[in-house]
A protein has these predicted regions:
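Extended, low-hydrophobicity segments enriched in charged/polar residues
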Residues: 24-169
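A short, surface-exposed beta-strand/turn
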Residues: 116-119, 201-221
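Bacterial signal peptide processing site
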Residues: 19-21
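Short, low-complexity, Pro/Ser/Thr/Gly-rich segments in the mature regions of secreted, periplasmic
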Residues: 218-237
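Short, cysteine-centered beta-strand-loop-beta hairpins and adjacent loop/turn segments enriched
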Residues: 193-205, 227-229
Length: 237
């Protein structure tokens, strides 16, 4: 009888040990729901801007750093207020060329400068600085607006439903998906820098963007969060 009890205890301990090995609370993902945001691209689409920069007023082509290409913005910018027609004005330069003034840039062997075309009071503006964006969109009054503003000024990405992608190797413990929170004074927007440059493995970093109500932003130190193993062998210049 005693021997049977010892054997039973051993089996229970072994089972618990196996379950604890499988359950690692430090690898959990803290999930958040994606906001329902959309951007109306009709203004620039109707002008044909997504096909050619010839849609731009003449003064835009005669100024320094003329726009090379125009792109639709992400629906994540749909929280910006006032709600104005907006599109990305892109310029590509290389390391030996003069940098283009921009709201933000993504830099590798080539540099992609992001400015915005925004229609204010019926007039199209080319906004090429953080101050220009702040002038148009401050004050920041709610969490969706803070999310859109942070994405627009940094180019960082929002990630949701991370657990559904089996190709992601989780590095942060825990990994928290994108959120936007207001503590009564400032907004904190949790985003991800997934810009690819060089050879893999490519690590996606999480960054907290602090947004004040008057439109100032500051960035936390980046934290290695996850990597997509399907891109480990990818090299990008």
């Amino acid at each position: 009888m005693k021997r049977n009890l010892i054997l039973l205890g051993f089996l229970v301990a072994l089972l618990i040990s196996c379950r604890l090995t499988q359950f690692n609370p430090f690898r959990r993902v803290i999930e958040h729901s994606a906001p329902e945001l959309t951007v109306d691209n009709a203004y620039f689409k109707d002008l044909g801007c997504f096909q050619s920069v010839d849609c731009l007023p003449e003064e835009f082509t005669n100024r320094p750093y003329p726009v090379q290409s125009i792109y639709q913005v992400s629906d994540l910018l749909g929280g910006l207020r006032p709600e104005l027609p907006i599109a990305i004005a892109g310029n590509v330069t290389f390391y030996d060329e003069e940098k283009v003034p921009s709201v933000y840039s993504q830099n590798c062997m080539a540099s992609f400068a992001v400015r915005y075309l925004i229609v204010v009071d019926g007039q199209m503006r080319l906004v090429d600085s953080y101050e220009g964006m702040r002038e148009i969109y401050a004050p920041i009054e709610n969490e969706d607006e803070a999310l859109s503003y942070a994405v627009a000024l940094t180019g960082y990405s929002a990630y949701y439903d991370i657990k559904s992608n089996s190709d992601y190797k989780i590095l942060a413990k825990p990994l928290e998906e994108t959120y936007s929170r207001f503590d009564g004074e400032v907004f904190t927007v949790h985003l991800f820098n997934d810009f690819l440059c060089g050879c893999g493995p490519h690590i996606t970093e999480s960054v907290d963007v602090t947004v004040t109500q008057d439109g100032e932003i500051s960035l936390s130190e980046p934290v290695d969060t996850f990597r997509d193993v399907t891109m480990d062998d990818l090299c990008i210049d």
